[in-house]
Amino acid sequence: MTIRVAVLGAAGRMGSTTAQAVRDAEGLELVAEVDAGDDVAALAGRADVAVDFTLPDVTEANVHALLDAGIHAVVGTTGWDDDALGRVSDHVGRTAGLGVLVAPNFSLSAVLAMRFAAQAAPYFASAEVVELHHPRKVDAPSGTAVHTARGIADARGAAGSPPMPDATETALPGARGAVVDGVRVHALRLEGLVAHEEILLSNPGELMTIRTDTFDRASFMPGVLLAVREIADHPGLTVGLDAYLDL
């Protein structure tokens, strides 16, 4: 059965890459390319799944409109907070089996790096995350870095790990980065980059670094297409592509 796909934010870099990937994919049909000013509700009856690569200030409204239209939503736009996720979870729970996937990253290497970091975290005394992106990215830290930090914190909490050592008493504002559930996260914005992340885990006398580098947006497309094909089998709200993988 052919899956009918709409792309929201189709004029953007990720949106246009996604639209082309859908055109080229077997078993998928691109039925709409939606941009600012277009009516999302008009997709009702035309699309089975919509992929959202828009902006943080509109993506939640887009998801609610898609759910009202009976359309599964695959969301790659970052900037989501717990309140917004809670509202979407409540809404999708009132639908007849629709699914919403909010994925901080569709790169398979990034998804695996997040999983590896969570698995390793209980065995190390310290962990910090450094994310590096192009200077046009509008949110910091990245959704990937936040998701990574939360995974580390959850794993350490489940293992009963003690607080991470840090004797810093004075620092310039921001010098030690943001704190996500007790994990320090640092955001760099440099021209020439696309998307990169380093996860540093250490013990006395040793350091392990998990690094993932994205050089081209095409690297996200296998994950996006996987999500489009699998979302109907995952009703409700899912955060993170790893839930769709057999890990």
From Swiss-Prot:
Keyword terms of this UniProt record: Amino-acid biosynthesis, Cytoplasm, Diaminopimelate biosynthesis, Lysine biosynthesis, NAD, NADP, Oxidoreductase
Residues annotated to bind NAD(+): 9-14, 76-78, 103-106
Physiological role: Catalyzes the conversion of 4-hydroxy-tetrahydrodipicolinate (HTPA) to tetrahydrodipicolinate.
Catalytic activity: (S)-2,3,4,5-tetrahydrodipicolinate + NAD(+) + H2O = (2S,4S)-4-hydroxy-2,3,4,5-tetrahydrodipicolinate + NADH + H(+); (S)-2,3,4,5-tetrahydrodipicolinate + NADP(+) + H2O = (2S,4S)-4-hydroxy-2,3,4,5-tetrahydrodipicolinate + NADPH + H(+)
Family matches, as CDD domains: DHDPR_N (cd02274)
Cell compartment(s), UniProt: Cytoplasm
Residues forming the catalytic site: 133 (proton donor/acceptor), 137 (proton donor)
Cellular component, GO, one term: cytosol
Gene Ontology MF terms in the entry: 4-hydroxy-tetrahydrodipicolinate reductase; NAD binding; NADP binding; oxidoreductase activity, acting on CH or CH2 groups, NAD or NADP as acceptor
Pathway annotation: Amino-acid biosynthesis; L-lysine biosynthesis via DAP pathway; (S)-tetrahydrodipicolinate from L-aspartate: step 4/4
Species this protein is from: Beutenbergia cavernae (strain ATCC BAA-8 / DSM 12333 / CCUG 43141 / JCM 11478 / NBRC 16432 / NCIMB 13614 / HKI 0122)
NCBIfam families tied to this protein: dapB (TIGR00036)
The protein's Enzyme Commission number: 1.17.1.8
Transmembrane segments: none
Family affiliation: Belongs to the DapB family.
UniProt name for this protein: 4-hydroxy-tetrahydrodipicolinate reductase
Enzyme class: oxidoreductase
BP terms from Gene Ontology: diaminopimelate biosynthetic process; lysine biosynthetic process via diaminopimelate
Binding site for (S)-2,3,4,5-tetrahydrodipicolinate: 134, 143-144
Pfam families named among the record's database cross-references: DapB_C, DapB_N
